[in-house]
């Protein structure tokens, strides 16, 4: 079998003579843009009267600016006017893993086309918030791709996956160690976009698709994210196939040995430490993964095609976007799934490239010898999760005043937190710890898991100044997930409660089944 032929839509879209051009466009895809070139490109669009607004999301650990772009027609003054427009507001970021470079270049192309090119009419129906070089420090850590991105098919020199502190920014959305994460969460909280897109490159298996994609994978399925998974991405996929671009749900083969491909295709983890999983708990969320074995120019074009097709689809369905986001905002589930496992597989046909052993084994991420032969294989596809432990969502959680660092995490996530203005006595439930397990070192932390259970509410006194986190709010389910002691990827996991964790003790997070009838004040 031959791989699906890429139609002319997948050629690099060259701008008109004299217009702004990206580094790959100027060099026949020989190199990727530097941080300075990205800033200069955006400045040139402003100078040309493109009708965009460029700002600074934040500053990297090494002092580089992280630019963002607002593309709207007419321009909006801020988040409130964007909401009043009724247009879907779409946040798109690239370069979170700075060696994965085509998202950055594709997003610059899309910004140019939206503002001074052939896609200008799209801004009549959608507002775009773009962050093309999210990991600015990693981008500038240029080195040979054989070292920084082994197995990626060009360019020869790229940046590094981690940020300037050595953190993987796409594992930082709960622990928030990096300034990039804190800045982007503040931006998301301010703008509250309807949809969130994150542009990547694969690391793994040899398959027959120009690009793979995923919705948020956390099993706490919101109306918005369920719609993305079941409808939006499938319709974008069909549109791209008509244009000659083959895509499929993200995953890797369990075993790349030709005779073992039928073992299955499996996605990644469900934890909200990954940005797309966190965002899928509150809005439309889409992950894009261009195929690393395709040439650089093709990967840029594939990513551009996916972004444009997604924007077109959202622009054509504004009422449905609003309805699903509104349903997500209004949802108040009575329980939260705090642990998960892969859902039972479905059977599907997946296009595999036959690969031969090259000394790295046959696992899903092993580098192997390509043959150029593609084969459709019927196999189990595991691309969803189910919950394995649910906890009831209370009326509110409470934390003693000493846990202000946890409150800062919640506030950056956009969670509303209050403080008691006076002492209160009433029924309070506590979580008894049976065991505390300290796991492996990961991303500057030792991951913690606990066993235990909630007891019956008993009379207790809460002093003035106690932090209160009501769950009847926009991000109530997110708050429940990160605060629940047994959560597989919450604040307990990431060591924020370590000093209070010991067997037979009570966890610092407690629950209320009714709000205290004393004055309460918002935490700014």
Model-derived regions: residue spans:
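Structured catalytic-domain cores with a bias toward divalent-metal coordination
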Residues: 1-4, 17-524
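Sec-dependent N-terminal signal peptides
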Residues: 4-13
């Amino acid at each position: 079998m031959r791989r699906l032929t890429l139609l002319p839509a997948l050629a690099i879209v060259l701008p008109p003579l004299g217009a702004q051009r990206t580094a790959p466009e100027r060099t026949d895809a020989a190199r990727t843009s530097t941080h300075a070139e990205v800033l200069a490109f955006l400045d040139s669009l402003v100078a040309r009267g493109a009708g965009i607004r460029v700002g600074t999301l934040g500053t990297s650990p090494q002092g580089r600016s992280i630019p963002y772009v607002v593309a709207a027609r007419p321009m909006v003054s801020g988040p409130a006017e964007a909401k009043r427009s009724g247009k879907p507001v779409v946040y798109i970021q690239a370069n979170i893993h700075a060696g994965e470079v085509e998202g950055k270049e594709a997003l610059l192309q899309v910004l140019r086309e939206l503002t001074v090119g052939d896609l200008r009419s799209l801004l009549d129906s959608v507002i775009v918030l773009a962050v093309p070089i999210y990991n600015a420090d990693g981008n500038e850590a240029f080195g040979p791709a054989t070292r920084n991105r082994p197995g990626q098919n060009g360019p020869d020199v790229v940046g590094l996956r981690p940020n300037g502190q050595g953190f993987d920014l796409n594992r930082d959305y709960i622990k928030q160690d990096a300034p990039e994460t804190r800045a982007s969460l503040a931006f998301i909280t301010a703008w509250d976009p309807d949809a969130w897109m994150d542009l990547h490159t694969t690391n793994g298996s040899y398959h027959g698709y120009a690009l793979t994609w995923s919705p948020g994978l956390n099993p706490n399925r919101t109306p918005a994210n369920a719609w993305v998974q079941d409808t939006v991405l499938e319709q974008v996929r069909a549109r791209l196939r008509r244009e000659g671009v083959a895509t499929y749900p993200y995953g890797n083969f369990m075993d790349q040995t030709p005779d073992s491909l039928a073992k299955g295709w499996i996605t990644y983890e469900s934890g909200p430490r990954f940005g797309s999983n966190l965002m899928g708990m509150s809005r439309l969320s889409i992950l894009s993964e261009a195929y690393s074995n395709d040439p650089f120019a093709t990967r840029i074009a594939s990513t551009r095609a996916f972004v444009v097709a997604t924007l077109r689809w959202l622009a054509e369905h504004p009422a449905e976007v609003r309805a699903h986001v509104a349903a997500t905002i209004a949802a108040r589930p009575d329980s939260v799934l705090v642990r998960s496992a892969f859902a039972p597989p479905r059977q599907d046909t997946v296009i595999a490239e036959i690969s031969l052993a090259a000394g790295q084994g046959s696992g899903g991420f092993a580098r192997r010898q390509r043959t150029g032969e593609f084969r459709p294989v019927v196999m189990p596809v595991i691309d969803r999760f189910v919950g394995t432990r649910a906890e009831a969502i209370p009326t509110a959680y409470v934390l003693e005043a000493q846990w202000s660092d946890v409150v800062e995490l919640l506030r950056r996530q956009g969670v509303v937190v209050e403080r008691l203005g006076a002492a209160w006595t009433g029924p309070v439930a506590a979580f008894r710890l049976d065991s505390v397990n300290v796991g492996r070192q990961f991303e500057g932390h030792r991951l913690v898991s606990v066993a235990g259970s909630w007891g019956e509410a008993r009379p207790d006194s809460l002093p003035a100044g106690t932090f209160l986190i009501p769950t009847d709010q926009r991000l109530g389910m997110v708050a429940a997930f990160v605060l629940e002691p047994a959560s597989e990827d919450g604040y307990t996991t990431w060591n924020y409660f370590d000093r209070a964790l010991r067997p037979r003790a009570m966890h610092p997070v407690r629950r209320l089944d009714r709000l205290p009838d004393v004055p309460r004040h918002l935490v700014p």
